[in-house]
Amino acid sequence: MPQTGPLSALTDDQTGREGRPANRTVAAVENAPQHPTPHTPVITAPAPASASATTATPGTTTGINATTTVTKELAHRTTDTDVFPTRWSRISDTRFRFTAHWSAAHPFFGPVDDRHQDPMVVGETLRQASMVLAHAEFDAPADTHFVMWDLTVSTDPSALLLSDAAEPVEIDVVCSEIRRRGRGLASMRTTMEFRRAGRFVARGTGSTGCTSPLAYRRLRGRQLAEVGTPVPLLPGIAPELAGRSRAEDVVLAPADRPGVWLLRVDTGHPVLFPRPNDHVPGMVLFEAARQSAAAASGQRPFLPRTMTADFARYAELHSPCLLETELLDEDPEEVTVRVSGRQDGEAVFTATLTSARTAEVRSPS
């Protein structure tokens, strides 16, 4: 299992022997930003936000305790409003401190009810901060493709209150299991602890691999040639069953039996698909797991205390992906759901999510 203990349990020089978690194959990939010249992309950073902050580009390393501004290019987003980590400083070669902001008004990672922010914002912030560090601190080139092997997040939903949304989030980061390829980065694990106003909010860890454009083209050449081919948009289930307030944010479609859904892929969604892609992004699969758990359990809101996901292969855009759920226990205080994604008879990912019990919304499927 991924390491989720206190950050103090990890030393600065802890590295993996193989640079890849055991029993992992391929995984969900975060594409490099698209550029007019695909073989030589360049990331440009805006001017510093203030005299005390700098900006970073891939291949640069910040000074100890220097504060650096996060750009949307480093975070692989296309709009500033989708970038959650705002700045960071380097404590040592493998320890960093980020500041993040979680807007209560974000169109996708917004409120889940009248009191709570969306716990999924923790995983997305971890994902973005990991890519920022890979580029700016560990020499991953601008055109790197990032491969997510696993992601684990634990949260305290009572600390994810809308009333605290204006407060900055402080994130302590340890990078471990670092594997180099030449001077660049091959893979690493990031472990993060999130606090707001001094209170523990969440802890998360994930392992990521780096793939060069050449290797990625060898691996995904056929799928890359199909980028831009229309993907049929399936009808979604009712938003309230998926734990969403807007129909356009639903990533589940009805299937032919109870407890099973089809992945609904909307390649025009501005947050889930900010740029053309050759596969379903990992954040879409993570969201599909949460929505499946909400629909299967009938819990509303479904506020995950723990979420784990392991990715086995790419989720393709042009083939049906089944999401199968299993309720694991009947604890009176909480509910745990296992979600398995399968495509063409093969496992794509597995996820397990646990939430406190709340009012139930019954699903007709």
Go through the PLM ranges and name each one.
Residues 1-114, 209-272, 364-365:
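Non-catalytic linker/capping segments at the edges of enzyme domains
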Residues 5, 283, 361:
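Basic, ligand-binding patches in group-transfer machinery
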Residues 98-104, 142-152:
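A short glycine/small-residue-enriched secondary-structure motif
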Residues 117-145, 280-302:
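Active-site helix/loop of acyl-thioester processing domains in fatty-acid/polyketide metabolism
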Residues 145-148, 154-163, 206, 218-221:
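A cross-family "folded-core" feature that marks the main globular domain of proteins
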Residues 151-197, 305-347:
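Hydrophobic beta-sheet segments that form the core/acyl-binding groove
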Residues 180-226, 336-365:
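Mixed-charge, glycine-accented linear interaction segment located at domain edges/termini
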Residues 247-322, 338-340:
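Acidic/His-leaning functional-site neighborhoods
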